[in-house]
């Protein structure tokens, strides 16, 4: 019965935000005048590149660090395990509902709390290189958990757009966030490639690792804290639930 009441409350909450706004519209320029837009865009900018780094560079990492090719049996098993762990994100979208039921928070506040929880999981990626000296399975598991956390984070950050903006503006805001995420991804992938070339050429040393492994450790450090930085800035820009009301 309580769950049914909470579902009704969730629907009522959403309806009150958008009740009189369906016929109103927001210009593309207006979108950039709201802190909520910048909060969403920054969250995407900081984190989208991490996901694509995990996907794009994982085979190269296994080859560089462990001399394991993904065309081999072990390499395929490792990549399969990484992607299988990432599928744990299926349960990530349920956490805000659990928080709402237990605390009575509004959906936006519950989503932000869930995102904070997810933002801590990528810190495990910091252990990828140190534990990689024991077995290649450890970094694969750490990266897989980081990937699962990203998808859980991503599902919730997209939902915050619907919490804060009227229906007529959701597509524009989502597009702005997607663009910011694309730019962030481009910067991270390009920078990672340049860093790996530099690290290999100069035999860079970082935290006891030399050459490309040192470069990977640097990028893993960046990826691991990106979500916490993104969340902190989002929270600073929009500390409390504040829907956009079009006049």
Report the location of each language-model feature:
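C-terminal transmembrane helical hairpin of 12-TM major facilitator-type secondary transporters
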Residues: 108-156
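A late C-terminal transmembrane helix in Major Facilitator Superfamily
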Residues: 89-90, 162-201
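Extracytoplasmic gate region of multi-pass secondary transporters
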Residues: 29-94, 146, 150-154, 158, ...
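Short, small-residue-biased leader/transition segments that mark boundaries at the very start
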Residues: 1-8
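Loop-to-transmembrane helix entry
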Residues: 67-85, 109-113, 137-138, 172, ...
């Amino acid at each position: 019965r309580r769950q049914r009441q909470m579902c009704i409350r969730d629907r009522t909450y959403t309806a009150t935000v958008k009740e009189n706004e369906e016929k109103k519209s927001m210009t593309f320029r207006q979108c950039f005048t709201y802190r909520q837009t910048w909060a969403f865009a920054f969250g995407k900018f900081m984190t989208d590149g991490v996901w694509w780094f995990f996907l794009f560079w994982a085979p190269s990492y296994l080859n560089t660090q462990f001399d394991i090719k993904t065309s081999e049996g072990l390499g395929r098993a490792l990549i399969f395990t990484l992607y299988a762990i990432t599928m744990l994100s299926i349960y990530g979208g349920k956490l805000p509902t659990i928080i709402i039921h237990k605390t009575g928070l509004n959906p936006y506040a519950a989503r932000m709390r869930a995102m904070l929880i997810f933002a801590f999981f990528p810190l495990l990626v910091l252990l990828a290189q140190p534990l990689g000296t024991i077995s290649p399975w450890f970094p694969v598991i750490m990266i897989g958990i980081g990937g699962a956390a990203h998808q859980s984070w991503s599902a919730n950050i997209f939902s915050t757009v619907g919490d804060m903006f009227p229906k007529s503006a959701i597509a524009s805001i989502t597009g702005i966030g997607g663009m910011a995420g694309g730019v962030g991804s481009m910067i991270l992938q390009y920078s990672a490639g340049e860093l790996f070339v530099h690290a290999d050429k100069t035999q860079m040393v970082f935290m006891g690792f030399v050459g490309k492994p040192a470069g990977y450790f640097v990028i893993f450090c960046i990826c691991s804290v990106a979500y916490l930085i993104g969340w902190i800035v989002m929270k600073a820009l929009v500390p409390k639930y504040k829907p956009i009301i079009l006049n």
